[in-house]
């Protein structure tokens, strides 16, 4: 049976574009559908733009494996495509003596995950690196960094186009049905609604992944995990950034905690926190800054009163609710939903940006196999 194209990707965020990039490199004619007017307008545009080392995630998990692999690929890609980035390193800080045992457990996990460039620091060594830091002990992740996420996605889009792929913005996904001879008929909405057939379908739609999977005919409802919206707000401050390195407290259940980063423009930013919400709402309540002061002063006691200014908010597609275990990413193929040629990605939150190129290779391997 002939099809209009080899593969259709739903979602032109970092992960969807990385999937398309991996497929066009393998010779797949690929089209990316994006409901917004430009690429990277969802989860990919409202995050910390941090390149993660891969410290925290359980050994053997998709997050651990694809973060470490993806980070290596990402630095190479950013350098070869002249996308702004900096391997500035990250300090994970124990601010109380009783936290040191947890810090050492993170180091053990990082080593088990194959993370390079890890160094255990005493409090004095950490303060020598970053005067003004409060630390009983710290871990230095030398391979962590920051990047221009939009520049990265623009570079991916350029590679996709150069290899014959296409990105259709303002083109919402309206549903799909499996074809008897294999493949899918994919319906689009919007002003130019149409139907196109493809051998393969990849749903990399971030917050919309569950809804998109639900519009695929015969997709089993029990194979679609619940979606929980994890909102996080960010604050910034004027003046000189206090630290050169990223600074993270010990992680809290379900998140990495409110951390500090210096972006590529030299601006200090703090966040995100975590609030489970019922609807997409990107407003920033200035009152949430009160909790930020208390959290930040645990590792930076000299944060001045009144320094924090509301910045922006993001929403993460979490697969767990408050108090529930923090699960792995879901990258589901026929073994999970029974539909050959379809890959659905659920819960691709942090470190999804870091791992995106490895995620794309993983998805391409599933379809090519």
Annotated model-derived regions:
Residues 22, 51, 83-86, 194-196, ...:
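Active-site substrate-recognition segment that forms the wall
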Residues 139-200:
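Helical element adjacent to the flavin cofactor pocket in flavoenzyme catalytic cores
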């Amino acid at each position: 049976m002939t099809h209009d194209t080899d593969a259709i990707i739903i979602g032109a965020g970092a992960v969807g574009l990385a999937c398309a990039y991996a497929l066009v490199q393998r010779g797949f004619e690929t089209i990316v559908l994006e409901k917004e007017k430009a690429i990277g307008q969802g989860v990919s545009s409202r995050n910390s733009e941090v390149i993660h080392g891969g410290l925290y995630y359980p050994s053997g998990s998709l997050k651990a494996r694809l973060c470490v692999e993806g980070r290596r690929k990402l630095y190479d890609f950013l350098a070869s495509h002249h996308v702004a980035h900096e391997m500035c390193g990250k300090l994970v800080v124990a601010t109380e003596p009783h936290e040191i045992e947890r810090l050492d457990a993170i180091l053990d996990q990082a080593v088990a995950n194959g993370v390079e460039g890890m160094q255990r620091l005493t409090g004095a060594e950490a303060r020598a690196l970053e005067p003004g830091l409060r630390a009983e002990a710290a871990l230095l992740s030398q391979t962590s960094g920051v990047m221009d996420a939009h520049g990265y996605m623009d570079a991916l889009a350029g590679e996709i186009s150069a290899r014959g792929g296409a990105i259709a913005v303002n083109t919402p996904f309206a549903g799909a049905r499996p074809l008897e001879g294999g493949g899918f008929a994919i319906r689009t909405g919007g002003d130019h609604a149409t139907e196109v057939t493809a051998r393969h379908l990849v749903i990399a739609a971030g917050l919309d992944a569950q809804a998109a999977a639900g519009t695929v005919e015969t997709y089993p409802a029990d194979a679609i995990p619940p979606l929980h919206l994890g909102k996080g707000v960010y604050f910034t401050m004027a003046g000189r950034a206090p630290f050169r390195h990223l600074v993270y407290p010990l992680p809290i259940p379900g998140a990495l905690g409110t951390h500090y980063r210096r972006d590529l423009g030299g601006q200090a930013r703090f966040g995100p926190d975590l609030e489970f919400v019922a609807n997409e709402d990107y407003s920033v309540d200035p009152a949430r800054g009160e909790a930020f002061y208390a959290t930040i002063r645990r590792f930076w006691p000299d944060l001045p009163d009144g320094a924090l200014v509301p910045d922006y908010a993001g929403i993460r597609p979490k697969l767990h609710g408050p108090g529930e275990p923090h699960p792995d990413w879901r990258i589901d193929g026929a073994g999970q939903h029974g539909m050959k040629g379809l890959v659905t990605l659920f819960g691709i939150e942090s470190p999804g940006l870091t791992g995106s190129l490895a995620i794309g290779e993983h998805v391409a391997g599933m379809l090519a196999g």
